[in-house]
Amino acid sequence: MSTNNSDIRVVVGMSGGVDSSVTAHILKEQGYDVIGIFMKNWDDTDEFGVCTATEDYDDVIRVANQIGIPYYAVNFEKEYWDKVFTYFLDEYKLGRTPNPDVMCNKEIKFKAFLEHAESLGADYVATGHYAQVKKVGDEIELLRGVDNNKDQTYFLNQLSQDQLKKVMFPLGGMEKTEVREIAKKAGLATANKKDSTGICFIGERNFKQFLSEYLPAQPGEMRTLNGEVLGKHDGLMYYTIGQRHGLGIGGDGEPWFVVGKDLKENVLFVEQGFHHETLYSDSLIATDISFTTNAEKPKTIECTAKFRYRQTDTKVTVHLREDGTAEVVFADPVRAITPGQAVVFYDGDICLGGGTIDTVWKNGAKLDYVG
């Protein structure tokens, strides 16, 4: 055990899953002064009256006791509601498709949680994210995780230098299979626990049903771009650009896809064919632009970008504008760019930062994806 690490306090965000369990285990093995914190972000009771957060916290307790670290539960429900859930609902009201994971990392895990950890004397916080940080000169670079399938830099694109200087990602250099193996060898209680998927506050519940509890659904017409009425939609908030499932349009030929929303008229526009021309665009305007380093940026950046999680990178040219927005021009047309989602910039394995997709363009004209 390294002696110098024992003077360094690391507070680990523990969710009750295998990734954060192994994160805490590794840091403890490396001799750090480790504290486990369970973040309670949502008052979550399933249909049987069981609070799933309680089950997860029980797993945190089991693992913390196994590896011999102190643990606490901290309630961030108010911060989460104000900063993440309110944003989530507001975006749906605007007809967009939000990314709560990006906002949660920016406002909760690496802000509210980081501040709480510092009040406990933390030198660093650590999470089970599949990403890497590397010190280069005076700055910290955010790098993709080694496991391509699990890399989570897309969701971390809004982190600043001040945040990155305080984080550790022990799993960033590992494949998921290795993480499971470490958990099994260490006999951790969460070694065989299945990964959680989807949006944390929805859990296993039906998305439509969940959203309708907070936003009133307004059914309306489903039309082609030529105005032919094909049926009814359940509420514009339930649909996203490029969506195929749940439209309820039968018949012969190719499947139908969502190609736009008219909020004023409450109309959902659909067209036939995966490669319908309306689904393709050549540029976008992004807001909330944030970079992971403080270095001076040129007005034009040649790099690659992701427009959704686990998507293959696309070559782009980013033009930073005076108003703080950015025009992102694609080397090749891209399908189903979705307003409200994150656009994230990369230079090789370095995550440069990103922003929020606001409008989508083709041949110099704005597409009416959300109008």
UniProtKB/Swiss-Prot annotation:
GO terms for biological process: tRNA wobble position uridine thiolation. ATP binds at residues 13-20, 39, 128. Gene3D superfamilies: Adenine nucleotide alpha hydrolases-like domains, HUPs, Translation factors. One of its GO terms (molecular function) is tRNA binding. Disulfide bonds join 104-200. The record marks 129, 341 as: Interaction with tRNA. Keywords: ATP-binding, Cytoplasm, Disulfide bond, Nucleotide-binding, RNA-binding, Transferase, tRNA processing, tRNA-binding. It comes from the Bacteria. One of its GO terms (cellular component) is cytoplasm. Belongs to the MnmA/TRMU family. PANTHER family: MITOCHONDRIAL TRNA-SPECIFIC 2-THIOURIDYLASE 1 (PTHR11933:SF5), TRNA 5-METHYLAMINOMETHYL-2-THIOURIDYLATE -METHYLTRANSFERASE (PTHR11933). This is tRNA-specific 2-thiouridylase MnmA. It comes from Listeria monocytogenes serotype 4b (strain CLIP80459). The lineage of its organism: Bacteria, Bacillati, Bacillota, Bacilli, Bacillales. The gene is mnmA.
